[in-house]
Amino acid sequence: MGYGSYSASDWSRLKSSRNLSDTQSVDEIFQRRACNPKFDPKFIGTRECFDSEEHPNTTPIVVGLDVTASMGYLAVEVATKALNQLIMKLYSTAAVEDPALMCAAYGDFGDFSPLQVTQFESDIRIAEQLLELYFENHGCGEVVPTCLWEFLSKHTNIDAINK
């Protein structure tokens, strides 16, 4: 993390190359059928969000998604529209300095993959990584967003906090 910036043209290219549409189903957008090991906390030591010459004052932002069956409509909205809108708004309003986003997917306690976390990114890679997440699409009422909080508290190294 720490290099590049996000642009509307990057989003347009990604959306076109993946044929993304808000009329698609969760399974059409999130095509993985198992958790990618690079997003599985079991295989992640630390996620870093460091300042760089290009981004000297990074502001970490985590977008957490409930990936249980009942929330599929929201994941589609985030993947096809809302993430792009959020990032464009952050850049156009300069609401925060040097935004670096991480996407996280959390499900039920008993899921195969109750938590997945991307890298912190400041460019189109965040949208690409979001689309690589596994949407488990189950649900038994034991959603665990607290596993995300635990991960963030123990497995991140963030300059904005360390300063």
Language-model segment annotations:
Residues G2-V62, A69-V76, M88-K89:
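Acidic, polar low-complexity linker/tail segments
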Residues I44, F50-H55, S92-A95, K154-N162:
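Surface-exposed acidic, glycine-flexible loop patches that form ligand/cofactor-binding
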Residues E54-V117, S122-N162:
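Von Willebrand factor
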